[in-house]
Amino acid sequence: MDELVTTQSFTATVTGSPRIGPRRELKRATEGYWAKRTSRSELESVASTLRRDMWSDLAAAGLDSVPVNTFSYYDQMLDTAFMLGALPARVAQVSDDLDQYFALARGNNDIKPLEMTKWFDTNYHYLVPEIEPATTFSLNPGKILGELKEALEQRIPSRPVIIGPVTFLLLSKGINGGGAPIQRLEELVGIYCTLLSLLAENGARWVQFDEPALVTDLSPDAPALAEAVYTALGSVSKRPAIYVATYFGNPGASLAGLARTPIEAIGVDFVCGADTSVAAVPELAGKTLVAGIVDGRNIWRTDLESALSKLATLLGSAATVAVSTSCSTLHVPYSLEPETDLDDNLRSWLAFGAEKVAEVVVLARALRDGRDAVADEIAASNAAVASRRSDPRLHNGQVRARIDSIVASGTHRGDAAQRRTSQDARLHLPPLPTTTIGSYPQTSAIRKARAALQDAEIDEAEYISRMKKEVADAIKLQEQLGLDVLVHGEPERNDMVQYFAEQLGGFFATQNGWVQSYGSRCVRPPILYGDVSRPHPMTIEWITYAQSLTDKPVKGMLTGPVTILAWSFVRDDQPLADTANQVALAIRDETVDLQSAGIAIIQVDEPALRELLPLRRADQDEYLCWAVKAFRLATSGVADSTQIHTHLCYSEFGEVIGAIADLDADVTSIEAARSHMEVLDDLNAVGFANSIGPGVYDIHSPRVPSTDEIAKSLRAALKAIPMQRLWVNPDCGLKTRSVDEVSASLQNMVAAARQVRAGA
């Protein structure tokens, strides 16, 4: 390397930052653009304001290196694909670049979107780039250079952030005989080398490459590949200083390999997996070690005393130790400031995004100026830790005793074949029964009624009356369409986790704790802070009302224990398995009550089963064991004649196929539309013998599938699953779609089922 732009290190930073806006401004702007209510210039203005405000806030808080290029209209993997020219041919017909971008993200009537799956073990979803033999990489640096220019004009100490080449290719999908995308690595490295020079020419002093794939077992060659890549990038003649960020786990052998390259800084996650043994890596001498010591994924306040002790063991192991969050704060809400309903004790235990930035700055100051410089902050932290440990709300002896008793007596149901016979005699369903996953469109009338209730413009009785009308409308629509098994549509539910959290002991639901799940989809994860209990039934009134309107079976709809954990901010003071069992006990009681009320089918959704799977294979069996046990605890209290359904969505199912079978649900519905039914062969390989409903169309896209298209998917599914075990359903709930889209799609789905059923 001939010339480095700068060698001056930084001391306090974050790995990345959210982009939806503190009041979900980006969600409203993008959805307005999609609906043609907002112009492109208006959308870009909102985006620019959000970026500038975020950079300004981070710099003002005391960070001396601020990440840029973390903003995205939809997803950072899609942004990277655009930057690298890795676009499928099917969008070439779209002339406008932004419309091309959203076509790949969401699809339209002519273009299928990219497949979507979970970002490692988080609840964020990314779009999977497609790499085929015809893919020709070409650099399109307009976005990253434009945002760097904006930030530098604002005098922000800017550090562009880019998904690294190893992670980008390992997370991409080879299509049309293209082989594994990682085989194109050498070709892609040349593009990144060119980008480094451009960033240096445009004023970047540091650049961050995100390589979270290095904490996984995605490829045994990853450590060697990463070392080769960053040796090449570090040798670029004129470039910014390079910081490679690993997060979500322990980089293992990749750490020493990276340290042997010419790069200047390496980030390690000390919250999820890594420990202070990295201090024993001699190759770190001369590097900046960016210590991810403040949890970027959960909302608990950092124990500053403990964090400083960990940091102390790192001093001397590297030329410089900088303090950072463990990962991007994309995964936590913006700030505690809007949460006016928090009691003082609970508030003192928490740190959202803004508070985590403050913790980073405090810890960096302690390293620079000594502990006495932050004595007040350490005292406040110690008081919060003591308050949380002693709070009586954290423990419920009765709940723990009941779990022990039920587990001791067994959580297995009867033989699956005998259950099927009993359920068939009760339900009298046709072959290829049609159903939906649960939720129906959240119409403007539903949202207005919920807002009116929150603002005290209507009372609870009026709200219930309006929601019952929505239930009646959903039942009527399903009967008109000819569906075989109905749902009540969930109009009363704001979210499939928050709805239950608001009724369970041990949870707190935030007012404004929004985080991005994918695109414009935002969720408000509740805070699970203590032992979980169910004070009263949660769904009986709604499901029994819906069942009273029809002779067809209506499914009871519940969220499973693993998903409730995955989509909440969960206590970190006891094993996840213990907390899962507490949630499972509450769900078990609800299933028993539903059965007693005459409900014949109960669905316990576990869309997040894959999400919590540890990234290293050595740790996965233990997780899958307790996850399956929790589901069985939740579902084994009902009779054999009661049919248990479950639903799993956007995941790489291969790694959890055995666990899906072990759940022993009578009917399992899964996402399969974007992945072209590939999961069915995996299920057959593990001897899956229960009924299955592979999603026959993608609800995350506005396009309406044709009858022939759905029939083709069903015929493909029948090659793997016999007709007597195959169900017909969309791949997920319909909450985010319009009534017109839903009606047209379901009409075609029912027609396709009848066509295939008749042998046409």
Curated annotation (Swiss-Prot):
Q: Name one GO molecular function term.
A: zinc ion binding
Residues annotated as binding L-methionine are I437, G438, S439, E490, D605
Pfam families from the UniProt entry: Meth_synt_1 (PF08267), Meth_synt_2 (PF01717)
What this protein catalyses is: 5-methyltetrahydropteroyltri-L-glutamate + L-homocysteine = tetrahydropteroyltri-L-glutamate + L-methionine
Q: What is the annotated role of this protein in its UniProt record?
A: Catalyzes the transfer of a methyl group from 5-methyltetrahydrofolate to homocysteine resulting in methionine formation.
User: Where on this chain does L-homocysteine bind?
Assistant: I437, G438, S439, E490, D605
Q: In which pathway does it act?
A: Amino-acid biosynthesis; L-methionine biosynthesis via de novo pathway; L-methionine from L-homocysteine (MetE route): step 1/1
Q: What is its EC number?
A: 2.1.1.14
Describe how the cofactor binds. Answer: Binds 1 zinc ion per subunit.
Q: At which positions is Zn(2+) bound?
A: H647, C649, E671, C732
Provide the alphabetized UniProt keywords: Amino-acid biosynthesis, Metal-binding, Methionine biosynthesis, Methyltransferase, Repeat, Transferase, Zinc
Name the record gives this protein: 5-methyltetrahydropteroyltriglutamate--homocysteine methyltransferase
Homology family: Belongs to the vitamin-B12 independent methionine synthase family.
User: What is the active site of this protein?
Assistant: H700
Tell me the gene name.
metE
The entry's 5-methyltetrahydropteroyltri-L-glutamate-binding residues are R24, E25, L26, K27, K118, R521, C522, W567, E611
